[in-house]
Amino acid sequence: SQMGVVLQETFLFAGTIRDNIAYACPNATDEMVIEAAKTANAHDFIMDLPQGYNTAVGAGGHSLSGGEKQRIAIARAIIHNPKILILDEATAALDTETEKLIQDALKKLVRNRTTLAIAHRLSTLRNADRLLVLDHGKVAEFGTHSELLENRGIYYKLVMAQQKLGAMPKEAEKKLPEALPAAEG
């Protein structure tokens, strides 16, 4: 298949960490698995596990944190190397430090491929080439992060609301134009 998916709720299969990363590419060499894990910022935590890449995880990966499971899913997508990638809330429900690791991994993963990213945490979308804003199931706005902020429409209001709530990481706030005051109403 030419399509890869990284979901908010990552599913891991019963087997080893290596098996889970290589799932979409069963003939992957150890070097390929390790390289994918490094790119996904997963290698270091994997090496801290009792048996490294040979550590067994049960179905669902309950012994791993959400961020660790997410990075394994990203490594799985990297090794699969799809032409089209779907990211469905890939950074939701993560702490800021883990989100940064996953953001860095996702930047590498989306490079040179068509990516459809679904997100409520708007900071995850700021580097997209093109954003589509849906309102009641219809495209209400489209453009780059900067263009949508300048238009002061729905996207702008959502970004401002997240900024006020503290839901936007500091590095994303720095990219907001200083000349744009918060939206009214």
Predicted regions and their residues:
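C-terminal boundary and immediately downstream tail of ABC-type ATPase nucleotide-binding domains
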Residues: 150-184
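Nucleotide-activated donor-binding/catalytic signature segment of Leloir-type glycosyltransferases, i.e.
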Residues: 46
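ABC-family ATPase nucleotide-binding domain "signature/switch" substructure
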Residues: 1-9, 17-22, 27, 31-42, ...
